[in-house]
Amino acid sequence: MAGVTEGEDTKVIESKINELNIDKPKLEDNNEAKGNGNGNESGDDDDDDKEEDDDNEITEPSTSTASGDEKKKKNKNKKKKKKKIVSIDSSYPEGIFPEGQWMEYPLEDINSYRTTSEEKRYLDRQQNNKWQDFRKGAEIHRRVRHKAQSSIRPGMTMIEIANLIEDSVRNYSGNDHTLKAGIGFPTGLSLNHVAAHYTPNTGDKLILKKDDIMKVDIGVHVNGRICDSAFTMTFNEDGKYDTIMQAVKEATYTGIKESGIDVRLNDIGAAIQEVMESYEMEENGKTYPIKCIKNLNGHNIDDFVIHSGKSVPIIANGDMTKMEEGETFAIETFGSTGNGYVLPEGECSHYAMNKGVEHLKPPSERSKQLLETIKQNFGTLPWCRRYLERTGEEKYLFALNQLVRHGIVEEYPPIVDKRGSYTAQFEHTILLHPHKKEVVTKGDDY
C-alpha cells in the first residue's frame, strides 16, 4: 500500500475412455504437495475449472448401445468439481513456514560482523514467533497472487477481481477479516494514470480492458504483522508497457539491495531514482521519460499499522534518517510517463482509524456506534466501504464523514498522475534481522 508524501493419437484414446465411462486419471500438481524453493505452493488450481470440450474430439465409428450413448451424454455434461481453498495451516501443521530470500546487508565495513555474530543469531531466534507470522502471511500472499495472475482477464469487473483476491486471502488465512489474521488492507487495483489507493466501492461498474495497466497491491496480516507486496499486470500483446515494467521492477530491486541496518533513507532513494530515470518509453512514435513519482514512498510497518513513521523515498530527498535493526519495511517504487507527481482524485474507498485518538469523542451517537464497529473489526488496519458493509453496516456514510472530519478516521482517496499517462508499481516487504535481511514476500513471479 503506497506511502504518500504530504504537500502483473491421445484424443482417440480419450474418446474410447469416454465411451466406456472410465474416469480419466488426474495428474497431481507437485507444487501443491511440496511447493518450490521460495514457498510458492500452487495449491490453488481451483480457478482452472472449465467444462470439458468434447465437441472437438476425434472419435472412431462406434457400435455402442443406446444405454452407452446415454452414459456418454451424461459424462459429457459433467463438470469438474472445484477444489475448495483450505487454510494455509493444513499445509504447515507444525507452524513452520517457508523463509523468504536472504540477503547480506550493504555497508560491508560496518555490518560484516552481523553475518557471523552468534549473539546476533541468538537475538534473531528470540523473535521467531514474529518472523513466523510474517512468513505465514507471505506464503498466503504468494498463493493468492498466483491465483490472481492465472485468473484475471480483461472483461472482468473490478468488483469481481477484488472479490477473487480477497476471498482467497480469507480462505487461505482461515479468517473472515478478523484481527487475528486476514486482509491487511483493501486490495489496490489502480488503472493507468491512477497510481494507488483505488479499490471498487459497491456498485462500481468499472471493467478491466485489454489495454489497461493495473497495479495490484495486496495486503495480508497474521497477528497484525502485515505483508505488503504489489505487482503490475498488463494484457496488451504489443509489449508497449515492457519498458516501464522493467524500469519499476529494477528500481524496486535496487531499493531492496541498498536497504539495511544503518543505511540512510536518502541513499536508498538516490539509488532508486538513478535506475528508474535511466529508462524511456515509446508510444506512437513519441518518447516519454520514465519518472519516479516523487511524492510516493516506501514505508516502515508496525503491528496493525501499515505506515508507521519512516518513509523510504524513491528520489534523493536529503533524509538522513537511518534504518534500524528489527524494523520492517515495504520497499515500493512507482514509475510514471506523466508528471511524476500525484494528487487525490475520485471517490474515496480506503480508510483507517488513526492511532492515539482515544481522547477524541465521536460527534454523534451514530458515529460512536460506527466507531465501535471499526475498532472491533479492523482496529488500526486499513479497510474499505465493502468491508464495512460485510459487518452489516448500512447507511453509514454521514457518520463516517463525521469521523473523518473529527480526525478519528483518515481517508485515503485514489491518487493520480495526469490523465493519459501510465504508472506502474512493484513492492516487497523486507525484515531487518540482526544478522541479515529477509525479502519475506519474494516469490518466483517477482
From Swiss-Prot:
Residues 73-85 have a biased composition (Basic residues). Binds 2 divalent metal cations per subunit. Has a high-affinity and a low affinity metal-binding site. The true nature of the physiological cofactor is under debate. The enzyme is active with cobalt, zinc, manganese or divalent iron ions. Most likely, methionine aminopeptidases function as mononuclear Fe(2+)-metalloproteases under physiological conditions, and the catalytically relevant metal-binding site has been assigned to the histidine-containing high-affinity site. The keyword Cell membrane does not apply. One of its GO terms (cellular component) is cytoplasm. A divalent metal cation 2 binds at D228, H299, E332, E427. Pfam families: Peptidase_M24. A divalent metal cation 1 binds at D217, D228, E427. It catalyses: Release of N-terminal amino acids, preferentially methionine, from peptides and arylamides. Residues 42-58 have a biased composition (Acidic residues). Cotranslationally removes the N-terminal methionine from nascent proteins. The N-terminal methionine is often cleaved when the second residue in the primary sequence is small and uncharged (Met-Ala-, Cys, Gly, Pro, Ser, Thr, or Val). Belongs to the peptidase M24A family. Methionine aminopeptidase eukaryotic type 2 subfamily. This is Methionine aminopeptidase 2. The lineage of its organism: Eukaryota, Fungi, Dikarya, Ascomycota, Saccharomycotina. The gene is MAP2.
